[in-house]
């Protein structure tokens, strides 16, 4: 039997000294990203992309260089939120992301389509591969915080992101509905399985504030987030209201104009990943 040369990638033997291979993909050598924050939800329709864009804006207002990687390949919306329509171009070094009015870097599959309304009809592994290429092929320029807008659920893309990108923390977006509690638990458990810290919850559509008396109206019923937060010993970082102004800003590509003060605790939790 030949002696071991220490290179497990070239050996098929299942010995006790075998080292587990890292699945982390290499960042484009011309790119620089300090921290990666994944924004996830257990189900669709809870406003995860809205929260992602607000977090990016809030962090940019603190003087940080920010990027948004739109990993929702079949339902991309980051270009709409920021009013960008095309990348800065590409060369032999890689692909340059779009730049928003305030300098937020954005990469999305919709920036690469001839017609943004065309559907992306790909199977799971191809979609996951495209997301990985947004890490390996895109030249993220001196990004302090890269926010990854994940597709809902716990399928191929979240698994690829958690395995391939050096995710520093996860923000879980929820809404106040019974079914969501069970689905949110799945998202927490997946992050735990991948050994990625969950920074906390952001409850979107938490309430509607009456324009006449200022009373908070629970449009979607009683929230159960306190119970699940206690179950997993995780903080609730924000409760965001139903705000037609935010929805209008999102649809018009004006998210950089919205008030993000309600996310100050979430921003603080993200900044603590630097410690």
Predicted regions and their residues:
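C-terminal lobe/tail of nucleotide-utilizing enzymes
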Residues: 1-21, 188-275
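Phosphate-binding P-loop
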Residues: 28-34
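Residue-level signature of catalytic and energy-coupling elements of molecular machines
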Residues: 33, 44, 70, 78, ...
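Walker A/P-loop phosphate-binding motif and the immediately C-terminal alpha-helix
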Residues: 35-73, 188
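Phosphate-binding loop that captures ATP/GTP phosphates
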Residues: 66, 71-116, 128
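Glycine-rich phosphate-binding loops of nucleotide-dependent enzymes
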Residues: 107, 131, 150, 163, ...
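Phosphate-binding/switch loop-helix module in NTP-utilizing enzymes
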Residues: 113-161
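Conserved Switch II/interswitch segment of TRAFAC-class P-loop GTPases
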Residues: 141-148, 154-155, 166-187
